[in-house]
Amino acid sequence: TRLYQAHKEAAAKATVLTAIMPDATGYGRVIRSAAGTVEKIVEEKDATEAERQEKEVNSGIYCFEAQDLFSALAEVGCDNAQGEYYLPDVLAILRQRGEKIWALAAENYEETIGVNSRLQLASAEKILRHRKNLALMESGVTLMDPDTTFIDTDVSVGKDTVIYPFTWIEGASSVGEGCVLGPSSRFSDTQIGHEVTAQFVYAHECEIGDGTIVGPYVHLRPQTKLAAQVRVGNFVEVKNSSIGEGAKLPHLQYIGDCDMGSGVNMGCGTITVNYDGKAKYRTIIGNDAFIGCNSNLVAPVTVGDGAYVAAGSTITKDVPSKNLAVARARQKNIPDWPDKRQ
């Protein structure tokens, strides 16, 4: 809008948006006359050493009178270091015709930076990341180290949330209030409730309920839904599963294709066996079930409400509500074994 207004007010045939760059390397330079009017724009490869010292650069954004633009384009040649047709040559052609050329400097050079290399892309991303982080901190979010915190532009974060270094929050993600996230975590397309604690976590296309604690070293795969007050501890992977309110998965579990009720306790080393080599099947665990350590739940299988599974069991049949399932060989102790094996 500013460029268009300046163009009309100046009654110019062409107006170019320029910027004063701290480092103008790689940009076309704006060359002005002693009176300050724009004479031409010269690409860096075609510029003289004196012209390369100029800090005012061409943003590549113009406002033209259409009739004059198309007339001048017919005269543009390719006699330059690149052998290309340069649009900025139109300005010199119009000036030679005695037409008025105008320039407007951008208020912030960062708005006009070009991206022609991986280095420039990284620089542009850093600028946008800094703006996002600044806005979050001004809204009440604590970033322990903004330089190592990466939050996409469209991500919303609630006030009083604390984010530790090396944390990525990207895509269609959102974070509630009063959370503690990171360090070294990545949340992609994930919705995080209020007062969630998550450290050393990778979550993709997930939902994490209020007051839930996740990590360290947890992988939440797509279609995982953790209800409120869930505990997912060390070295746990959850995939395509819904975990009920207050359930505990404290350590060393694989939970895949599972519908788990509220108040469930999963013992260390317990897994859902969801794949038979051809198809995947679901495991259903009722409310307040207690699954002992080192157990295998071979899907399709259902463990009823309030049921118990003894440690070390491999469960292949449904366990009715409030039943205890024991599926392991009886222990046999052989006395004086060292003597007998001789």
Labelled PLM ranges:
Residues V30-S33, C63-F64, V115-N116, D152, ...:
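Short beta-strand-to-turn element immediately C-terminal to the catalytic PLP-Schiff-base lysine
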Residues E39-H130, L134:
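Catalytic-core segments of class I nucleotidyltransferases/pyrophosphorylases
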Residues R95-F200, I208-I213:
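Extended, small-residue-rich solenoid/repeat segments and analogous flexible loops
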Residues D189-Q342:
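Glycine-rich hexapeptide-repeat left-handed beta-helix
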